[in-house]
Every structure is written in C-alpha cells, then in structure tokens.
Amino acid sequence: MSDQLQMTDGMHIIVEALKQNNIDTIYGVVGIPVTDMARHAQAEGIRYIGFRHEQSAGYAAAASGFLTQKPGICLTVSAPGFLNGLTALANATVNGFPMIMISGSSDRAIVDLQQGDYEELDQMNAAKPYAKAAFRVNQPQDLGIALARAIRVSVSGRPGGVYLDLPANVLAATMEKDEALTTIVKVENPSPALLPCPKSVTSAISLLAKAERPLIILGKGAAYSQADEQLREFIESTQIPFLPMSMAKGILEDTHPLSAAAARSFALANADVVMLVGARLNWLLAHGKKGWAADTQFIQLDIEPQEIDSNRPIAVPVVGDIASSMQGMLAELKQNTFTTPLVWRDILNIHKQQNAQKMHEKLSTDTQPLNYFNALSAVRDVLRENQDIYLVNEGANTLDNARNIIDMYKPRRRLDCGTWGVMGIGMGYAIGASVTSGSPVVAIEGDSAFGFSGMEIETICRYNLPVTIVIFNNGGIYRGDGVALSGAGAPSPTDLLHHARYDKLMDAFRGVGYNVTTTDELRHALTTGIQSRKPTIINVVIDPAAGTESGHITKLNPKQVAGN
C-alpha cells in the first residue's frame, strides 16, 4: 500500500505543473480522456469552468490571456473536441493573445498506422498552421518541460496560441512520485523585456518633432502591454492626437480632448507622420493605402520585427516590447521636447465637432421600432454611469455602431471580434472577462452573432456570473427584411426568425429576461441587470430594415458581374 501511495500518473503531474506555474483557472469541456484531469485540478484548487462547446471555452481562455498577460488554459477532448477548439486557438494566435489549448488524444501507435483508434486524428500536425507552436508529450517525465515551453512560447515576443497534445496513455502512465516532482519546471521570467535600439528611439522622436500633423494610433498590442501611464504621459506631453483601435479604447478615455476618433477619416488622410503603437497596418487600417496620404511617414512600435514594412515602408521601426519602447521614448523626449502644432489640433477639433453634431442628430431621433442609433444611445447613457464594467461586442451593424457610439473610460475593458472579425466570441469572452475580473460584464450582441454561442447562457447561469447580454434583434443577418429570390416563401439567406424572444431563454436556466421596445425600457433593464449582478438577457426589438449589408465593411463583398 505504501509503495502505491508513492506512485503518480500523468494527469496528476500536469495538474501539479499548472499549479506550480500559478495557473488558477481552466476553461474546457470534459470527456475521454481528460475528465479525471479536470476533477483533480479542482481538488488541487484550480478553478474549472465547464462549457457547452470547446470553441467558447477557447475564447474565454484567450480573453483571460489578453486581460492578465498569463496564458489562458483551454482543455478539450480528442479529435472532434480538439477541432472545435481550434478556431479559438487560431483566433488567439492572429490577435496576439496568450493561450494554451491542452487536448487529450488517442494512442500514437494506432494513430500513426491509421488503424482506426477511438477519435483518431494527428492533432499536433493539424494544429501547427494555426498556433504559434504545437507540442506532443510522449512520456510522463516530459510533461513538466512541455508545459514550461508552452507557457514561455505563449507569452514571449508577440503572444499567441500554443497547442499541447497529451495522449491518453501518457495521462495514465505512472511514475514514482518523488521523481515526478523533480521533472516539473517553474517558468522564470517567461516574457523578458525586449529593449528597442536607442538609435531607433532617437530617430522616432526626431521625426515626430519635425511633423506638422502627427498622429498616434493605439492598437490592442498597446492595450495588452499595460503601458497605460507611459502612453498617457507621452501623448499629453507632446499633445499628439491619438486614434485608438477598438480594443485599445480606454487606454486614454474616449472623451479625452486629444482623441481623434470622431475625426478618424480626416486624421488618417491628412497626417504627415503616424506612430503605430502595437497596431498593424492590416485590413482594419486599409493596409495604410486607401484613404491615406501617399507621402505619410510611419513610425512603428512593435514587438515583432517581421511586422515592419508589411504594407507600407516604415521610416522608423522601433522593435521591442511596448512598455520598454515607451520608456525609451519618454527618456528621449526629455532631451528633445516638442509640442504638436496647435493648428493641427484645432482643425481636428473642428472636424470632431462637425461629426459629433451629425451623430447627435442620429442618436436623438425617436423611432418605433428602435434603430441601432437610438438604442445604442440608451446603452451609452447607462454605461457612462458604470465605467468599471467590461464590454464585449460582436455582430455586424451592432459591432460597428457600438464601437463608434459607446465611449470607454478604462483600459482593457472592451473585447470584440478583433483582427479576424470572427463571430461567436461573445459568450466566451464575456465568461472569460467575468471569471478573470470578478466585475460585471455587458455583452452587446447582434442576434445573428449571439446564435453562434448562445447555449453558453447555461454556463453563465450555472456559475451565476454577473453578465448582462443585450441582443439587438432585427430578425436577420445584417437586417431582417431580406427577400427570398426563389419566390417559394422560404426565408431569405439573411433572414432569421422574426419576433424571436431571446429573453425567454433565461426561463430555462433561472436567469432574468427582459423584452424591450423603447429606450426607457432599455435603460431600466440594463441598469437593473448590471446592479443585480444576475445573469440577464435583454431582447431589444430593432427595426428589421435597420442596418446595412455587412455593416461598415460592405465593400469587402465581391462584386457580381451579373446581379440577381
């Protein structure tokens, strides 16, 4: 009996390794061969959050990674469960969120000979194109070092998703307990500072000082860096206007006088020097081409050197982590002080005021049914009084309009579809943000977007999370007034069920539901949902004719030679 007590197995080893590396939460869906691993993690004090679908579990893990700078852990079963989680792993990698997906897998000896094992799949090689790295463990004594490598890879350099493959026979393999403990590695300084070249920093300050119309663009890499105070000090010292990308909103409050968000198009078209801080010149910024001046000069602060010159020539690359780079910029600024020309700030303010007036007219229009603008105006009123909440946002028109209308006041409080524009992140991100922060979360969802992960409301209710889900329901993908070209009475490809009552879903799970048709009802329901800290769905009835095809990115749809 005493000899048996001194033995351990792979699943106990991996849990102990997680514990020693201060991993306190696992998001997942259990089944063969990982159920007992989740049970043991709970027994060891690691919080396990069980989901209804692996994709949402992965999104929750990724959101946790973005908010904490520690890898979020997603646990899945083999093959189908692994594939369900793979979208979330790829999304984490594309967006630069640290995440580790741990999946059970089948016996390698059978899989490699394709002999038809239970849920047979070569998962490691399937994961490689979509992850920053993928590792498979073939013997229990390597579990500790494998997890250590996964942690370091996920958070060092540009963060991303890492896949860790744990075959069932490795989870069940035994080792002498004392020996097993010696194989566990506690990762030290997993994400060391990467200092920029001093000459690059000097050149960046010199170019900004000469600029007549400088602009700073803050990306979600800047938000992830948590260099909030350095960024604020630099912007306020130089008086350079800034433009936040959607998940960078709140690094400086959206109401800050130097925010150029309300004059975005004018600022991009007229800036002569643009400093990108943790932002990429990808499709979200028209690759730095359409809508930009041809002679704009770019400074780019990024941790990934391969990102430099990806679409436009970068006059001054500053390669390093954002916090170290901004520290260097501030130090150099003390030696070479400058202030942005007032005329540039004044002309931006004129355009901001003009656009704000146009938006005010849209927001103040009273319609029945509601449209996106007056409904979001009501949401904005409530969230202005609840600035600590975390906001999750997905959809087409719901996303695009909410991004422009709802102000953020604190960093890393907004989570949305990100670089990929992926739908289905809503409930996973909301759960991840709630579990990580303990704060109330408001998820503003298009009705189509909500459908991708809607069953996770059971997860929200099971854990009694303070999540309020606001569903903008216009009965369709983009809009709900599509016409079926077949003429046979079938729904159009973009139609959903009209007059759906999403609020009644909460009856099944003992949550709270509201159906609202006016702005006053919406304000009351949202305020009550936040203050009660109870799982809540608010079904907001929106005009089916409100919205546009694909929201603000209609132009990305291919043009037909012959229209239908």
Task: Please tell me what each predicted stretch does.
Residues 2-339, 382, 466-469, 501, ...:
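N-terminal alpha/beta PP-like core and its mobile active-site loop of ThDP/TPP-dependent enzymes
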Residues 219-223, 364-365, 446-448:
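Conserved short loop/turn motifs at secondary-structure junctions
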